[in-house]
């Protein structure tokens, strides 16, 4: 996407968010159930009991969330929380870990911090739940609860996965086996091939209304700027690899939309630039809001945080603040960053 188109897209996004901020609340649940898959961007507590570095059930995470620290990788709500609100759910979709059997009739969140498309992704972080395992958990949940296929075909499904396959696999140092075996195009193809398998399994299990979130500009996160960007700017090698993946993911969406009853959509998290958020008063994009110890990416436990959190893009060195999550969720739900459908069309 050229620079002018990117600017226009995010100006529209800002307008959508401004309208959404004053719009009346949705009355009535627009879809019978909502299932969430992915990584730390969507995780809301599935990692809390795991032996992993990728868990955040401590302050200052959740400092602005009504339940406090829950395992969400932000100061407040994450993207699925806001989408659930926009779709008319009275409560956030609960994590699969610890949920009741009956909850599978309403929705579950299977996402896991450090989760990836490839099984070996994030081995450096400890225990995590890969996309393959998340799909298996979904199968177990809906079979145990005997959720009718007719109901599952009406549900909303959102998936955010792939970032860790780059951050905690392909671009790790020293080079991983994947980096030695594949060039960026080959690696993206390997990821999409696996993704296709898991999406096909979900389709067989009833998934018809599916939003696939692309990878954002992870080469511009504080973590990657400090390591691969030389501390001075975005790591373009990382961003270029992400562009290859996202392009193939869009094509995958097109392929699935040729299947009977399928309404798959791609959510573009890449095209916006930090300066585009200035229209919303979100002006700090080069550092985290919370205190992050040298060489780390997550907030230091009980460390100081910035008082003006609505001005920050990044909560820690990788994950975004609640205000950014709200902007993205509104833009994906109402347009304009989702194509060929926005999420409101999937639930209606």
Swiss-Prot record:
Predominant subcellular localization, coarse grouping: secreted
Subcellular location, record wording: Secreted
Top-level taxon in the UniProt lineage: Eukaryota
Enzyme Commission number, as recorded: 3.1.1.-
Keywords: Glycoprotein, Hydrolase, Lipid degradation, Lipid metabolism, Secreted, Signal
Keyword Hydrolase tagged: yes
GO MF annotation terms: cutinase activity
Family per similarity comment: Belongs to the 'GDSL' lipolytic enzyme family.
Xref: PANTHER family: GDSL-LIKE LIPASE/ACYLHYDROLASE-RELATED, GENOME ASSEMBLY, CHROMOSOME: A08
Protein name stated in the entry: GDSL esterase/lipase At4g30140
Species this chain originates from: Arabidopsis thaliana
